[in-house]
């Protein structure tokens, strides 16, 4: 099979993975309107082509939280990576490390902090959910600090799980789910051998270490469902800010006022995100939400963005809309499921090449030169010829 884009990895992953895993990764909340808009809205962002500029010294390097990145991309937190490839978190982290970008370990990873951190040279990032069990949160933070994690990504858009219709149909949940998953596994031999048999243990490593006993997929579904905390507020985050002495990023911002609250709280960064369309269907795509948020807090806090990014062109679009760096989710997971570390490494190379093409043809020699001036049209609205700063109304 010829691999030239993330879409090729998606097609390959669908053949390799049991349906319950593919659709858990690929699906979104409710009718998946926001999931689709994340991708479609980015595709409507038209760039301004410029020609006859000397682009021989083009550079993708950037700095974030005093870390040098080879390009403004990080691998975002994705749960259960180790169910998509053998010890998947370790493989993805190694690919990111080799490319000179951060890897973010999810709270609900298969491989625990202590397995992933020693496998790479640069400090990894760690993602934490808002959970009722504050003992687990403190334990996870202590272990992340001990392992040398540099940045905490605190996910706040999951006070309750989203309703994901695909999960019930695919076997992740619903009637006879365990039996359906077993039957799917035995009919997908490549996955069954590589991950099902040789990728064990299939624990939720970070949670198992805390509970002192093995955990599995049923524990993942049940433990998380019982531990999400809808009562959380900014005040509840103060002890985390006091405890964590490194950069702290608030993930799940879609409104400018919430972004301003993050600045007032003292966060070092935000992630403009709708959780990949997996939480509340019908909310703004990240591409639509980003310009107004950037207008409100750009320069006061680092702005990261995710949801809908599939290639290097999308990275350039997000930066032009106001992001400093982007997080990849599904795109790298498709590659991981298809070819492990090598797949993720190849995807990152593709994204880098695509970024270089986009920057060359828009006349941006550096990441700092990718601005709103790089845009001609945003979400169906043509910008003035002078390309004046985008009006706030354009973001809605």
UniProtKB/Swiss-Prot annotation:
Residue span, FMN hydroxy acid dehydrogenase domain: 1-380
Bilayer topology term: Peripheral membrane protein
Cofactor(s) the protein requires to work: FMN
Domain of life: Bacteria
Annotated InterPro entries: Aldolase_TIM, Alpha-hydoxy_acid_DH_FMN, FMN-dep_DH, FMN_HAD, FMN_hydac_DH_AS, LldD
PROSITE patterns assigned: FMN_HYDROXY_ACID_DH_1 (PS00557), FMN_HYDROXY_ACID_DH_2 (PS51349)
Binding positions (substrate): 24, 129, 164, 278
Record function comment: Catalyzes the conversion of L-lactate to pyruvate. Is coupled to the respiratory chain.
Family note: Belongs to the FMN-dependent alpha-hydroxy acid dehydrogenase family.
Protein name: L-lactate dehydrogenase
Organism this protein belongs to: Escherichia coli O45:K1 (strain S88 / ExPEC)
């Amino acid at each position: 099979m010829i691999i030239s884009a993330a879409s090729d990895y998606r097609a390959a992953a669908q053949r390799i993975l049991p349906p319950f895993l593919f659709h858990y990764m690929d699906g979104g909340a409710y009718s998946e309107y926001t999931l689709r808009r994340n991708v479609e809205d980015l595709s409507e962002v038209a760039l301004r082509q410029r020609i006859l500029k000397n682009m021989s010294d083009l550079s993708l390097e950037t700095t974030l939280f005093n870390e040098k990145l080879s390009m403004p991309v990080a691998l975002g937190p994705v749960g259960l990576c180790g169910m998509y490839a053998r010890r998947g978190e370790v493989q993805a982290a190694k690919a990111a490390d080799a490319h000179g970008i951060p890897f973010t370990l999810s709270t609900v990873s298969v491989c625990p902090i202590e397995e992933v951190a020693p496998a790479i040279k640069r400090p990894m990032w760690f993602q934490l959910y808002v959970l009722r069990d504050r003992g687990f949160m403190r334990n996870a933070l202590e272990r992340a600090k001990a392992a040398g994690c540099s940045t905490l990504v605190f996910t706040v858009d999951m006070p309750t799980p989203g309703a994901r219709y695909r999960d019930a149909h695919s076997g992740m949940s619903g009637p006879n789910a365990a039996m359906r998953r077993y039957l799917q596994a035995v009919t997908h031999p490549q996955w069954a051998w590589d991950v099902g048999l040789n990728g064990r243990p299939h624990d939720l490593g970070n949670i198992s270490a805390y509970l002192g006993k093995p955990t599995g997929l049923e524990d993942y579904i049940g433990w998380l469902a019982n531990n999400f905390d809808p009562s959380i507020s900014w005040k509840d985050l103060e002890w985390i800010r006091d405890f964590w002495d490194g950069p702290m990023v608030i993930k799940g911002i879609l409104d400018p006022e919430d972004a301003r609250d993050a600045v007032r709280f003292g966060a070092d960064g935000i992630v403009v995100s709708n959780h990949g369309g997996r939480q509340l269907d019908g909310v703004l795509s990240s591409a639509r939400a980003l310009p107004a948020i950037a207008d409100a807090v750009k320069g006061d806090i680092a702005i990261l963005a995710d949801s809908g990014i599939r290639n290097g062109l999308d990275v350039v679009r997000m930066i032009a809309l106001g992001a400093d760096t982007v997080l990849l989710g599904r795109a790298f997971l498709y590659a991981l499921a298809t070819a492990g570390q090598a797949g993720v490494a190849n995807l990152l190379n593709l994204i880098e090449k695509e970024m270089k093409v986009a920057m060359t043809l828009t006349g941006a020699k550096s990441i700092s030169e990718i601005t709103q001036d790089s845009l001609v049209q945003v979400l169906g609205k043509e910008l003035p010829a002078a390309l004046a700063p985008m009006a706030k109304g354009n973001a809605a």
